[in-house]
Amino acid sequence: ATLAQIVNHNAWPRTSPGEVRRRLASWLESQGIDTTKSFDAVQGAATPRTAGTTDKTSLSEEENMLLKKQVLFPATKKAFGLFRDPFADEAMQGSDDVFTTPDIRYVREALYQTARHGGFMAVIGESGAGKSTLRRDLTERINRENAPVIVIEPYIIAMEDNDVKGKTLKAAAIAEAIISTIAPLESIRRSQDARFRQLHRVLKDSSQAGFSHVLVIEEAHSLPIPTLKHLKRFFELESGFKKLLSIVLIGQPELATKLSERNMEVREVVQRCEVVELLPLDNNLEEFLTFKLQRAGKQLTDIMDASAVDAIRARLSNPGSHRKNMVSLLYPLAVSNLVIAAMNLAAEIGVPQVNADVVKGV
């Protein structure tokens, strides 16, 4: 691995690079090779650097590459005998295509029980953790089982937590979304008091008809604090002992900060909202890759060897603020982009299987 880093990337070991160079030269001479200019071409190709030292430009390029959308080239599909991209969004045709771990199964079932029987929960995960996939799976399951649940999803296209960056989602807009979804033929009242009375009435009428209602807000980390406080009042709309509206918030870790118990502004919400987190794949990485490839008719060993899986895990695990802590970026989207890029590179250079060196070369 050290030699591969020197040859491919001109990355010398941090400790004793001179000693390593001397030993390499000695070995080359023992093979009858003139070492006078052996390292000149390498020096001309790039300025030597030691492993573990990166400038801001190269670090930025690596981060951008991890976030960039990757596409499986036609030549790559042909080389590996694939007829479709197993990691593409289009490969997600139904609930059978959703990869699950014990943690994901819990979140999946908690979402359904909240929608079906009531509750207030927040699903939090990094970008690419699979939040939107679980939201689509919830809608699919409700439709498939013909459950008496009405899903209300306000449009959040321009939503931000202040009016400088975009438009804040206010309680009035949420009320409009609920009324328009449950009673689309009714005209929405203009005055605030009349509108909220109308909201309460249509919820009660729908509930008496046997329906449950769930309000699903994606990108909830962009909700302003006042709207979060108002959601508690939506949640408290009742008909007798029955709650009329369940609430599901889906957002990135910034939402967890807003829902912190140390944030006294939203203490009423925090006491009522269950927060669940979508964790990285970590120990389930190999199962994830196997599942995705099997859905496309391939085995993991047809595409990559064991060293590639370890290299993917190492590539997407970074040291945290403390040396002993590792920050895992093993989320489905990041893993998929890295694997697709590695497969494209393997096909380009003619390697039959993705291995650790190919992953490192991406």
How would you name each of these model-derived features?
Residues 1-113:
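A short, basic N-terminal segment
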Residues 143-177:
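AAA+/P-loop NTPase substrate/partner-engagement loops
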Residues 116-137:
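Walker A/P-loop nucleotide-binding motif
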Residues 111-118, 207:
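Phosphate-binding P-loop
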Residues 65-79, 167-230, 238-242, 281-285, ...:
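Mid-core helix/loop region of P-loop NTP-binding domains shared across ATPases and GTPases
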Residues 141-150, 184-185, 239:
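Post-Walker A helix-loop "phosphate-sensing" segment adjacent to the P-loop in P-loop NTPases
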Residues 12-57, 64-65, 294-362:
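C-terminal alpha-helical "lid" subdomain
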Residues 160-161, 211-213, 233-315:
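The catalytic "switch" region of P-loop NTPases
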